[in-house]
């Protein structure tokens, strides 16, 4: 059990026999009336996000989620295979469980897998990854670091929007949460 004071992003709650992860929360203390906590909860099974408001101090049942450090090994055609770093057990994970971040996976990349009662719930990739540009159109004379963008295909096959000065062969830092370009890595 936890109170609303214990809320933090990533905490998994058990509400209405469903596991819901806190994506966002905000403590609100209005000038008149009692304080409350506004949250955005993501159903860990369906991925649906809902808004829910709790009165401050309310006790809520939390789910005991086991986070394990694992290493992504390979894609066997249908599933993504990861290995537990402690006992070297290999576990296949479905594409639905991997989510959109799967397009940035490289072999031997560290990931965190969250389990509830020995069932994998969700996978967390590193916040940013460094990937090489496999193909992008050449930049034009006069391209500057500010301005437009163009598509670039990365070594994993993912396509992202990058600034015009990026060339094939550059190594880029990419945010795995939204697929956005962060910076060019000096080689």
Curated annotation (Swiss-Prot):
PROSITE patterns for the chain: EFP
GO molecular function, one term: translation elongation factor activity
Pfam families: EFP, EFP_N, Elong-fact-P_C
Localisation: Cytoplasm
GO cellular component, one term: cytoplasm
Top-level lineage group: Bacteria
InterPro entries reported for this sequence: Elong-fact-P_C, NA-bd_OB-fold, Rib_uL2_dom2, Transl_elong_fac_P/YeiP, Transl_elong_KOW-like, Transl_elong_P/YeiP_cen, Transl_elong_P/YeiP_CS, Transl_elongation_fac_P
Gene Ontology biological process terms in this record: peptide biosynthetic process
Keyword terms, alphabetized: Cytoplasm, Elongation factor, Protein biosynthesis
Intrachain S-S bonds: none
Pathway connected to this protein: Protein biosynthesis; polypeptide chain elongation
SMART domains: EFP, Elong-fact-P_C
HAMAP family: EF_P
Function as written in the Swiss-Prot or TrEMBL entry: Involved in peptide bond synthesis. Stimulates efficient translation and peptide-bond synthesis on native or reconstituted 70S ribosomes in vitro. Probably functions indirectly by altering the affinity of the ribosome for aminoacyl-tRNA, thus increasing their reactivity as acceptors for peptidyl transferase.
Family indicated by similarity: Belongs to the elongation factor P family.
Matches recorded under PANTHER family: ELONGATION FACTOR P, ELONGATION FACTOR P (EF-P) FAMILY PROTEIN
Protein name in the entry: Elongation factor P
Gene this protein is translated from: efp
């Amino acid at each position: 059990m936890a109170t609303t004071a214990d809320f933090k992003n990533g905490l998994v709650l058990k509400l209405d026999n469903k596991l819901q992860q806190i994506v966002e929360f905000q403590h609100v203390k209005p000038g008149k009336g009692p304080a409350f906590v506004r949250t955005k909860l993501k159903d860990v099974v369906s991925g649906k996000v809902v808004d829910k408001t709790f009165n401050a101090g309310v006790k809520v049942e939390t789910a005991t989620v086991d986070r394990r450090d694992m290493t992504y090994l390979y894609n066997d055609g249908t599933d993504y295979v990861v290995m537990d770093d402690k006992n070297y057990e290999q576990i296949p994970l479905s594409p639905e469980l991997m989510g959109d971040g799967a397009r940035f996976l490289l072999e031997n990349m560290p990931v965190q897998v969250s389990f509830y009662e020995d069932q994998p719930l969700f996978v967390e990739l590193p916040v940013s990854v460094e990937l090489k540009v496999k193909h992008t159109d050449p930049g034009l004379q006069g391209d500057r670091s500010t301005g437009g963008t163009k598509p670039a295909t990365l070594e994993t096959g993912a396509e992202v929007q990058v600034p015009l000065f990026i060339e094939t062969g550059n190594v880029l830092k990419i945010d795995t949460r939204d697929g956005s370009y962060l910076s060019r890595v000096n080689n």
